[in-house]
Amino acid sequence: MAAVVLAATRLLRGSGSWGCSRLRFGPPAYRRFSSGGAYPNIPLSSPLPGVPKPVFATVDGQEKFETKVTTLDNGLRVASQNKFGQFCTVGILINSGSRYEAKYLSGIAHFLEKLAFSSTARFDSKDEILLTLEKHGGICDCQTSRDTTMYAVSADSKGLDTVVGLLADVVLQPRLTDEEVEMTRMTVQFELEDLNLRPDPEPLLTEMIHEAAYRENTVGLHRFCPTENIAKINREVLHSYLRNYYTPDRMVLAGVGVEHEHLVDCARKYLLGIQPAWGSAEAVDIDRSVAQYTGGIAKRERDMSNVSLGPTPIPELTHIMVGLESCSFLEEDFIPFAVLNMMMGGGGSFSAGGPGKGMFSRLYLNVLNRHHWMYNATSYHHSYEDTGLLCIHASADPRQVREMVEIITKEFILMSGTVDAVELERAKTQLTSMLMMNLESRPVIFEDVGRQVLATRSRKLPHELCTLIRNVKPEDVKRVASKMLRGKPAVAALGDLTDLPTYEHIQTALSSKDGRLPRTYRLFR
C-alpha cells in the first residue's frame, strides 16, 4: 500500500521528482527557468551584446523611391520603383482582356489566365517552372480582367535575371499543348459551376451589371468563358488572339524592389528581338472600339432557398444591383467619383472582418441601420480607360424586393443633394487611409505602377493622389452625381424576381425628385 501511495505522489509531482521520495510541506518553492548569465539583467530598451545590429528603413527622405520609365526600341515599356527589402515583385502587364474579344470566341482571356505558367520553350512543365522559382523563394500568379492581363512573380531580388527570363518565356513562348488545353477546359468548366453555386453572388452580379450597361460591346462582353465556347477554343484560336494583342507596344514590364538599370538590362536581354511562339510579332487586326454605355436590365431567375455553406441554411435572398455611368480613370472627375463611392460605403448586415468599418457611411446610416430586413447594401465603382460604372448592390427577402429597390433609388437621388462637410471629410480621410495602407504592400505597388504606366505611360505618386483627394469639394461631388443621374440606369437582378419593379419604373424613379417608384394598382391580390 505504501508503494502505491508513493507512486501516486510521484506522478502528481511530475517526472522531475522521481529521484526524491520525501514529501515537502509549507510554501511552494519557485523554480528559476533562466539559465543564468547576463541577458536577464539587460533592459528591453538596450540591445543584446554580440547580436548583429539590424538595418532599418530610413525616413529622412534622402532616398526618394520614384517611378522610373524607359521605353525600348520595340515599344515595350519598363517601369520600376525601388523599395526597401530583399524581395521584389516583377511582372508583365498586357493591354488585353475580355473587352477585346468582339472578333473572337468569348472566353479566350479566361483560358489564357488558366494556361499561364504552363510548359514553354525552355520549361517542360509547370512543375519545372515552380521548381525554378522556389530556388529564389518565388511564387507566381496570373490574373485577367476586362482590360488587362497580368503575369507576376515575387522572389528574391538576387534572382531578377532568372525571373525576367522566365516571365518572357511564359508570355512569349508558351507551348499550349493539347493536353494543357484539355485540362484548362475542365478547369474553366469547374469554375463556371462554382460561380453559379457559390453563396456570394457578387462576381456573377458584376458580370450581369456590365452585360446590362454595355450591351455586347467592349467591357460588356463576357468576362468568363460561356459554356458553349469551352469545347471550341483550341490552340489555333488562342494563337490568333495572341498574335494581335501580345505585342511589345501593348506590354509593360514592371518591377518593385529592383534597380531600374538592372531591370532594363534584363528586358533588353529577354524581351527585345524575341520571336514569339505564334510567329509574327506585329499585330494584324486590333479592336480599338470605345465603350458605348447603353443601360438596360439583365435578369436571372434562380431558386436561392437551398443555398448554404454547411448544415445551417442561408436565408433566401434576392440580389439587385443598380448602376449608372460615371467616368473613366483618365478624367478629372475620377477622384470626386472615388470620394462619392467611399461616402456611400455600405456593407453587409454582418462582417467577420471586425466591426466599425464604414459604419458612418450613407448606406449604413440610411439603409442598413433603418431597415433591419436588408442583408446587404454596398457601393462599387468600376472604372476603365473610356468609361466607368458606379453601382449599389442590395439584397433582401424576395417579398420585399420592391421596397428594397425604392430605397436604393432614393439613395441615388440623395447623392445629388446636400453634402455634409463632416461626412465629406470622413470619406476623404477614409479614401486616403485606404490608398496609403494598400500601398504598403509590395504586390499592390507593383500593380499600381504597371496599370498606370500601361494606361498613361506615367505614374501619379501617392502624395499627388492624396492632394487631389484633399481638394475635392462638396460641389464637386454634387456636380458629378447630378451628371450621373441624367443617364439611363443599368440593372442586374438575381433570385426570385416575382416582385421586381419593371425597368421603366426604376428609370422613372431615378428621374424623379424623391426616387419613389410609380404606384402600381392591382385588381386582385
UniProtKB/Swiss-Prot annotation:
Keyword flag Electron transport: no
Localisation: Mitochondrion matrix; Mitochondrion inner membrane
Protein known as: Mitochondrial-processing peptidase subunit alpha
Species per Swiss-Prot/TrEMBL record: Pongo abelii (Sumatran orangutan)
InterPro entries cross-referenced by the UniProt entry: Metalloenz_LuxS/M16, MPP/UQCRC_Complex, Pept_M16_N, Pept_M16_Zn_BS, Peptidase_M16_C
Function in brief: Substrate recognition and binding subunit of the essential mitochondrial processing protease (MPP), which cleaves the mitochondrial sequence off newly imported precursors proteins.
Oligomer and partners: Heterodimer of PMPCA (alpha) and PMPCB (beta) subunits, forming the mitochondrial processing protease (MPP) in which PMPCA is involved in substrate recognition and binding and PMPCB is the catalytic subunit.
GO CC list: mitochondrial inner membrane; mitochondrial matrix
FT transit peptide: 1-33
Biological process, per Gene Ontology: protein processing involved in protein targeting to mitochondrion
Keywords: Acetylation, Membrane, Mitochondrion, Mitochondrion inner membrane, Transit peptide
GO MF, any single term: metalloendopeptidase activity
Membership in a protein family: Belongs to the peptidase M16 family.
Subcellular location, principal: mitochondrion
Signal peptide: none
Gene3D superfamilies reported in the protein's UniProt record: Metalloenzyme, LuxS/M16 peptidase-like
Domain of life the protein comes from: Eukaryota
Chain positions with N6-acetyllysine modification: 299
One Pfam family linked to the record: Peptidase_M16_C
Residues with the N6-succinyllysine modification: 64
